[in-house]
Amino acid sequence: MKQFMDEDFLLSNDVARTLYYDYAKDQPIFDYHCHLPPKEIAENRQFKDLTEIWLAGDHYKWRAMRSAGVDENLITGNASNYEKYQAWAKTVPLCIGNPIYHWTHLELRRPFGITNTLFNPQSADKIWQECNELLQQPEFSARGIMRQMNVKFSGTTDDPIDSLEYHKAIAEDRDFDIEVAPSWRPDKAVKIELPQFNDYIKQLEQVSDTEINGFDSLKKALSKRLDHFDKRGCKSADQGMEIVRFAPVPDEKELDRILQLRRNEQPLTELQISQFSTALLVWLGAEYCKRNWVMQMHIGALRNNNTRMFKLLGADSGFDSIADRTFAEQLSRLLDAMDQNNQLPKTILYCLNPRDNEMIATMIGNFQTGGIAGKIQFGSGWWFNDQKDGMERQLQQLSQLGLLSQFVGMLTDSRSFLSYTRHEYFRRILCEMIGRWVVNGEAPNDMNLLGNMVKNICFDNAKAYFK
């Protein structure tokens, strides 16, 4: 019987262990998509206690606590940090079988060094004291943890109207050598159907010093902000796409009319919404291509399902799930519309519904281009797929239908500075899968070949892709 989460956790054979320890384990982290607050990095936040760094904003943990029957006051309410922590300690033993159980113990192991101890109500007080003492040390500040985890790059998620003042401060700080770059998230400008669209356009007018009275002036305003992001080192754009829409792009006169209808609070048809979003995304794709940015598309979330809790807590609070819309044809036509003028940027496609894995894995082959290895990527298992089975499915289907060797690897997609251990989780799963291939005679026992492939997937491919 194996020991729980020992040093060889998830590594069942000698090949997997060699690949992990000799090629994967010590690779730096290129975390190209996350939701860390740049303010906390710029100000090098020192967290007061374990609840602040571990539970605040972590909707994975919040969902588990709700499923365990924990009162909302002990999750997002006014209970003390210690009370919230104790509620989490009571919840964790109930999470066996959920990746949260593994993540919890990995997050205690690194960076806190707590091993051979199960997290539960009995161990909670000792762990609380030990971790809170460590959190007062410089090595456990926001920047200190990033250094401990060997992070080389962090791509945050930012709105076009953001000032990026904290990215500027980080870049100008000669005492901090980790690159922190903004990522452009234009959802509020693209999704003309959102209730807050008109208020957002007013904000965009202010920050861009541009009156938006038509589609061309909207592009001018966004172009100014694109330049601002580019100046601050942006390498990537990210689209959240609950619905993948496509419609043939009409002339600019019709786009002006659609925008004017919306500015006048008039209802739009589904066709008009699709025409507007298609036109803007195709234009944005060309702008990304011109700046050599990567375009990421996160497809298939069903958001804010619980109206009562949305009114109470707002978005990103743990009330989202997997949607089941089909979107293959719309996605194909959208990518093709960008590609027809050779203006499809490097692109990473993520799907939330694992049903869509094979579709995405084959879709990327339609738009690959000579001169850019792996130009179009099937992104790592996202959100609800960010677990052992989900990661294995994505890796297997990419390897079967594309080129695993060109994969840009893992990202945290997290709001927590303790989530970097997800890279370790991914690397162990990757090495175990390849190790099984070798043991079964499905891949050669060539450590130079396989080791370099693992090394590339863990770091080098992403570094080259986002250059």
Curated annotation (Swiss-Prot):
Keywords: Isomerase. It comes from the Bacteria. Pathway: Carbohydrate metabolism; pentose and glucuronate interconversion. The gene is uxaC. It comes from Mannheimia succiniciproducens (strain KCTC 0769BP / MBEL55E). The keyword Isomerase applies. HAMAP family: UxaC. It catalyses: D-glucuronate = D-fructuronate; aldehydo-D-galacturonate = keto-D-tagaturonate. Belongs to the metallo-dependent hydrolases superfamily. Uronate isomerase family. One of its GO terms (biological process) is D-galacturonate catabolic process. This is Uronate isomerase. It is an enzyme of class 5 (isomerase).
